[in-house]
């Protein structure tokens, strides 16, 4: 076998007849498969052992030679070679066709490659190939046109008119083959290039297409006549198996039926030709043979598909490759693996961050070979066979061995759907009883797991390298930050939040207030014995906590705090300030001075002068974790998280929060608020009946009134709530629920959406405490159903979006340290109207500067060029009043097939500079796709006159942007830079005209009457600026402005959608995707290069082609940038393997074969497909020479040996 890891590239071409013969081990002459009595393959049939190899290892068909010692001998009795049965997966046969047959991919594809080569229409080709018309091949001296079609009658008439042999006309694939042989590629190409100089319109488009195909044949060395088959390869029998079912019947692959039809028809044709049968019968048989081969290659592409039993269309060779169940996606990109298991998950609150609980019986099965090796090593058993029996019997001694084996051997846990890289993490296994996997509660957020019956899969990394990578790169304790935004992903939730919230509450006048303790232990003792309450404010000696970063003025004093906060601060990392207040100042700058007693001061006096602090909420805990990570990195953070979790669980149990109906408060003035709203609605309806407002206005006014009523109730609820109310505590701490849930319980449910998405005017006035009436209940079912269907649709849509994103960016890898570009991107805060969607500070963090940044007033250099901007530096730049900064960006990176470290910046998942080899494309795709399910599905209907457009938001808008579609509610943009001089309204056409005066001339733009204007007379506008509200069409913007403007616009638009839904995503991820959409240019004028006009090519390839021409003093080619949607960009990738495994498999392969494309295996998918280690991370060439050394050399028993011995 070829060593996959030594592959440099992979090429696909058309196979010549001689090539097909060289593959073949013999001709399949009979349609038989296996003998019904002996069940042995028939000679010269589709499963023949002589052609394809033996069905049993090292055994010929007749049984004369058995055993491996006869390896390579060809049996003199049956003619079968003694070898492994595995060769039946690789040996091919062939069928000699008695008449040429056209290949349906090349004749039927769009555009038809045969048609373009011959300059004939697909319809004409079809008539010839399927024997409906003759085609003139050589008119000789007659006035007939070459390639003209003649019907049967016309052909006879012409023969009589000009005499037999005066011209050559044929039908069928044979005629096409003759025509293809006559094509003079060089002459045709020269002629077309000449024609292009003057052609325009449709004629030019057709010439460019033909030139493309002919040039492909010319350059690849493929001959056009190979598109017609004279010999048909037969794929190996094990790839179209026939298996016996329990009832003695056989199940066979559809391909066998399709091959059988071809062989039957071919043999019948051979017999007819021998008998010199009448032409019409032969013709009919040839047509049937053509149809049989068509069905074998792509059943159903032309006419009705051939069906099997139950009128089910048979699966042809093309179907074996296509779609989710095809070869590419089912077997090459995703494989089933051994050493894996799956079970329901349960919570493991006692586990450490890096541990998971694995049921004993699962672990013994997963680690079986390792356990068996240890049994033999310890001499509990003499050989592997005995060891295997010992494990299967469940001998007592195996459990101790299992404990040893799993120590330090990480396992991988995966939860489907794996939306981002945190969907697979490594843990150290801990053996547990029971049958469920135990999962650490803090990693649930990364997996999006809960314990209502979710299942997870477990995998065992086997090799030393795999174990090392799992431990160093994938251990759950290492994954503190989310790759999408660099924020902690392991924030505590629910009980943990609630426990810490309860612990850090403060209360005035509780027992023990004003007591002073010498240290933590004394305070805890007082609390345990009932002398002090958890929430009572007490004093503690600062010197009992010497490791905290106190100011000098604070040492040796007494500090006012609560018993709960003493416990809370006890689990904090030592160098973190003592936390009294849930704010950033306390966290970063230290404990405020007001909590410290001056000598001789009365503690009660200080306590009375202090405000009651709010407890620590979920958000505050997140900030503490982020700060801890920033200062101490992963090890300390994960240990701290475990302490935080334990403390939270312990105290949420102690708090004993319960919820009863009495905990839902009653709002005293609810009736008044609702009566006022009813009164206002009545007035609005009255005004409408009098004709003072339109129906749209009335609808908006009514819905607004009810919305305001609901808000008034909500406001009243917040004002009157008791902070110790359990529901309020849950809501306020961020443990569960929000104000909207609370107001539905205690206020009113409010307005509901109708099935059509429009909001109904009748609100639900009741709340859940009072209970809903039957009608109200009925109304609310619409919303509930819509919620369910939306979620289901959204999940599928979001998953497909992620798949397309991954596909377009999977080959973007950090390939070098610095690309040395001199370009940069000028960034400022992203705004939407007056609202800031993303601040400059957020955009600067973790990026490199392109130019030095100076203080706008003093001129002092804040940071030099090409320096990394840290979080603190970003704050400093913004505080200095800088509004825009030029940074290194993925958009301007000059690295080929990837990005350099400096243009990318920091890796958000680690907080450090990104490493060479990081697969940033895939991470970007996951970061954008994973929150896709959180985005809404709706297209908002803004009822009312305000706008006549539907503003697309949420997931549909993201798809619109990435697919570069024309947006709904498109804005009119100006092509002129200048001033708006006039806006005139034309009532007759219901439009407005906007006039922009530029330096070179006046621009006139027609705008719909109802569109909302963004500009006024006198405004200065730049090229590409929007005159009306709405989304700009990016392709139009590209025509008016440059690539960078389009990239910046798309980046801002994506961020607006995500930020409006409260989802934060790092700019760099969007940059990676947008850059992939703009990586191609279209050649306009080839100049002196040998490029073809109209060709799509990578910018780097285009630059290379021009470089040589410019050096030699020729005219360089000109091009225009092209914006492609992600689906099209994926299909236009340089890798045909990646494109074929994505979509439109047959089209991609047809095209690649004609061009003789070479895949240089630069991306991830291509390497996964051929089974090579991916060129990212540790698989990158620069890291491949490192030899891992095990601490103690250990051998792992091969499974095949075990099964061989067991037999």
Swiss-Prot record:
Coiled-coil region(s): none
Residues annotated as binding Mg(2+): 450, 452, 454
Keyword Transport: no
Catalytic function, reaction form: RNA(n) + a ribonucleoside 5'-triphosphate = RNA(n+1) + diphosphate
One Pfam family this sequence matches: RNA_pol_Rpb1_2
Keyword check for Zinc: yes
The record's free-text note on cofactor binding: Binds 1 Mg(2+) ion per subunit.
Source taxon at top rank: Bacteria
Binding-site list for Zn(2+) 1: 60, 62, 75, 78
Cellular component terms per the entry's GO annotation: DNA-directed RNA polymerase complex
GO process terms (BP): DNA-templated transcription
CDD domains in UniProt: RNAP_beta'_C, RNAP_beta'_N
Protein residues bound to Zn(2+) 2: 819, 893, 900, 903
Keyword field: DNA-directed RNA polymerase, Magnesium, Metal-binding, Nucleotidyltransferase, Transcription, Transferase, Zinc
InterPro entries noted in UniProt: DNA-dir_RpoC_beta_prime, DNA-dir_RpoC_beta_prime_bact, RNA_pol_asu, RNA_pol_N, RNA_pol_Rpb1_1, RNA_pol_Rpb1_3, RNA_pol_Rpb1_3_sf, RNA_pol_Rpb1_4
Needed co-factor(s): Mg(2+); Zn(2+)
Role of this protein: DNA-dependent RNA polymerase catalyzes the transcription of DNA into RNA using the four ribonucleoside triphosphates as substrates.
Family under the similarity heading: Belongs to the RNA polymerase beta' chain family.
Quaternary structure, from the entry: The RNAP catalytic core consists of 2 alpha, 1 beta, 1 beta' and 1 omega subunit. When a sigma factor is associated with the core the holoenzyme is formed, which can initiate transcription.
NCBIfam families on file: rpoC_TIGR
Protein's name according to its UniProt entry: DNA-directed RNA polymerase subunit beta'
Organism lineage: Bacteria, Bacillati, Bacillota, Bacilli, Lactobacillales
């Amino acid at each position: 076998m070829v060593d996959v890891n030594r592959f440099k590239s992979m090429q696909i071409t058309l196979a010549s007849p001689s090539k097909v013969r060289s593959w073949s081990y013999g001709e399949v002459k009979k349609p038989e498969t296996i003998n019904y009595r002996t069940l042995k393959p028939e000679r010269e049939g589709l499963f023949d052992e002589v052609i394809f190899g033996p069905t049993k290892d090292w055994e010929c068909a007749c049984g004369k030679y058995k055993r491996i010692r006869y390896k390579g001998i060809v049996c003199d009795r049956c003619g079968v070679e003694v070898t492994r049965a595995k060769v039946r997966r690789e040996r091919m046969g062939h069928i000699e066709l008695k008449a040429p047959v056209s290949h349906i991919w090349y004749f039927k594809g769009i555009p038809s490659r045969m048609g373009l080569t011959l300059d004939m229409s697909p319809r004409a080709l079809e008539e010839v190939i399927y024997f409906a018309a003759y085609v003139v091949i050589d008119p000789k001296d007659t006035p007939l046109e070459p390639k003209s079609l003649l019907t049967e009658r016309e052909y006879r008439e012409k023969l009589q008119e000009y005499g037999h042999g005066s011209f050559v006309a044929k039908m069928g694939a044979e005629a096409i083959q003759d025509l293809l042989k006559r094509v003079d590629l060089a002459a045709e190409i020269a002629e077309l290039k000449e024609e292009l100089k003057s052609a325009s319109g449709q004629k030019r488009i057709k010439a460019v297409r033909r030139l493309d195909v002919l040039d492909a044949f010319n350059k690849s060395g493929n001959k056009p006549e190979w598109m017609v088959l004279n010999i048909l390869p037969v794929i190996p029998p094990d790839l179209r198996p026939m298996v016996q079912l329990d009832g003695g019947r056989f199940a066979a692959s559809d391909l066998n039926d399709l091959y059988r039809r071809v062989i039957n028809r071919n043999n019948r044709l051979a017999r007819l030709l021998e008998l010199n049968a009448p032409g019409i019968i032969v013709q009919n048989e040839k047509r049937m043979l053509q149809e049989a081969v068509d069905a074998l290659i792509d059943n159903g592409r032309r006419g009705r598909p051939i069906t099997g039993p139950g009128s089910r269309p048979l699966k042809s060779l093309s179907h074996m490759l296509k779609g989710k169940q095809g070869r590419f996606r089912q077997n090459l990109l995703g494989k089933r693996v051994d050493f894996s298991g799956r079970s329901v998950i349960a919570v493991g609150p006692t586990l450490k961050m890096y541990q998971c609980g694995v049921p004993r019986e699962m672990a013994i099965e997963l680690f079986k070979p390792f356990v068996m090796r240890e049994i033999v090593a310890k001499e509990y058993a003499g050989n592997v066979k005995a060891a295997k029996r010992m494990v299967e019997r469940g001998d007592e001694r195996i459990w101790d061995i299992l404990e040893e084996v799993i120590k330090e051997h990480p396992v991988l846990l995966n939860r489907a759907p794996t939306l981002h890289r945190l969907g697979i993490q490594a843990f150290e296994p801990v053996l547990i009883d029971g049958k469920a996997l135990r999962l650490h509660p803090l990693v649930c957020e990364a997996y999006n797991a809960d314990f209502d019956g979710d299942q997870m899969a477990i995998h065992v990394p086997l090799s030393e390298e795999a174990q090392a990578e799992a431990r160093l790169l994938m251990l759950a304790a290492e994954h503190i930050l989310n790759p999408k935004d660099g924020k902690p992903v392991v924030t505590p939730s629910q009980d943990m939040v609630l426990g810490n919230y309860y612990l850090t509450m403060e209360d005035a006048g509780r027992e023990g207030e004003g007591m002073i303790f010498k240290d933590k232990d004394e305070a805890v003792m007082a609390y345990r014995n009932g002398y002090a309450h958890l929430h009572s404010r007490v004093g503690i000696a600062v010197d009992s906590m010497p490791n905290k970063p106190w100011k000098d003025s604070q040492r040796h004093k007494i500090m006012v705090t609560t018993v709960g906060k003493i416990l809370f601060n006890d689990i904090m990392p030592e160098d973190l300030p003592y936390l009294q207040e849930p704010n950033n100042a306390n966290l970063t700058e230290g404990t405020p001075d007001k909590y410290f007693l001056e000598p001789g001061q009365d503690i009660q006096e200080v306590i009375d002068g202090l405000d009651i602090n709010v407890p620590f909420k979920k958000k505050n805990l997140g900030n503490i974790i982020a700060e801890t990570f920033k200062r101490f990195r992963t090890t300390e953070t994960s240990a701290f998280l475990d302490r935080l979790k334990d403390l939270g669980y312990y105290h949420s149990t102690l708090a004993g929060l319960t919820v009863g109906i009495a905990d839902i408060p009653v709002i005293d003035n609810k009736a008044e608020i609702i009566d006022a709203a009813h009164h206002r609605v009545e007035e609005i309806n009255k005004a409408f009946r009098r004709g003072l407002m339109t129906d749209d206005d009335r609808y908006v006014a009514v819905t607004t009134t009810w919305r305001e009523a609901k808000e008034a109730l909500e406001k009243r609820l917040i004002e009157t709530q008791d902070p110790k109310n359990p529901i309020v505590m849950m809501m306020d701490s961020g443990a569960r629920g929000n104000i909207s849930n609370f107001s539905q319980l205690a206020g009113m449910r409010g307005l509901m959406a109708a099935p059509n998405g429009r909001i109904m005017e009748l609100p639900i006035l009741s709340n859940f405490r009072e209970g809903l009436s039957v009608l109200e209940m009925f109304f609310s079912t619409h919303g509930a159903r819509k919620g369910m269907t939306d979620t289901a649709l959204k999940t599928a849509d979001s998953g497909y979006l992620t798949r397309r994103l991954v596909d377009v960016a999977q080959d973007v890898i950090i390939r070098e340290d610095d690309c040395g570009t001199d370009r940069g991107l000028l960034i400022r805060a992203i705004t939407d109207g007056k609202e800031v969607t993303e601040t400059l500070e957020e955009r600067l963090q973790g990026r490199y500067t392109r130019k030095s940044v100076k203080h706008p007033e003093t001129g002092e250099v804040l940071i030099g060029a090409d320096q990394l901007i840290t979080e603190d530096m970003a704050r400093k730049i913004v505080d200095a009043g800088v509004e825009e900064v030029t940074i290194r960006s993925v958009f301007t990176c000059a690295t080929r097939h990837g990005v350099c470290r400096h243009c990318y910046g920091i890796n958000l998942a680690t907080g450090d500079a990104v490493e060479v080899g990081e697969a940033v494309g895939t991470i970007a795709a996951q970061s954008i796709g994973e929150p896709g399910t959180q985005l809404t599905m709706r297209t908002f209907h803004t009822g009312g006159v305000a706008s006549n457009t539907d503003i697309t938001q949420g997931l549909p808008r993201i798809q619109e942007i990435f697919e570069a579609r024309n947006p709904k509610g498109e804005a009119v943009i100006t092509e002129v830079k200048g001033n708006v001089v006039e806006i005139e309204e034309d009532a007759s056409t219901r439009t407005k005209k906007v006039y922009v005066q530029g330096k070179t001339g006046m621009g006139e733009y027609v705008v719909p009457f109802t569109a909302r204007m963004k500009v006024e007379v006198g405004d200065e506008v730049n090229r590409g600026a929007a005159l009306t509200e709405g989304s700009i069409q990016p392709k139009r913007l590209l025509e008016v402005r440059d690539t960078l403007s389009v990239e910046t616009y798309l980046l801002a638009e994506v961020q607006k959608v995500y930020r409006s839904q409260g989802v934060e995503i790092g700019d760099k991820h969007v940059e990676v995707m947008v850059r992939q959409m703009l990586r191609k240019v279209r050649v306009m004028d080839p100049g002196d290069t040998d490029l073809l006009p109209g060709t799509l090519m990578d910018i780097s390839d285009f630059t290379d082609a021009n470089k040589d021409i410019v050096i030699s003093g020729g005219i360089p080619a000109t091009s225009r940038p092209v914006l492609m949607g992600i689906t099209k960009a994926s299909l236009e990738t340089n890798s045909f393997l990646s494109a074929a495994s994505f979509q439109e498999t047959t089209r991609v392969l047809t095209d690649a074969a004609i061009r003789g494309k070479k895949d240089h295996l630069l991306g991830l998918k291509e390497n996964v497909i051929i089974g090579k280690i991916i060129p990212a991370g540790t698989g990158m060439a620069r890291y491949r020479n490192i030899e891992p050394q095990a601490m103690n050399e250990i051998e792992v028993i091969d499974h095949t040996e075990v099964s061989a011995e067991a037999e």
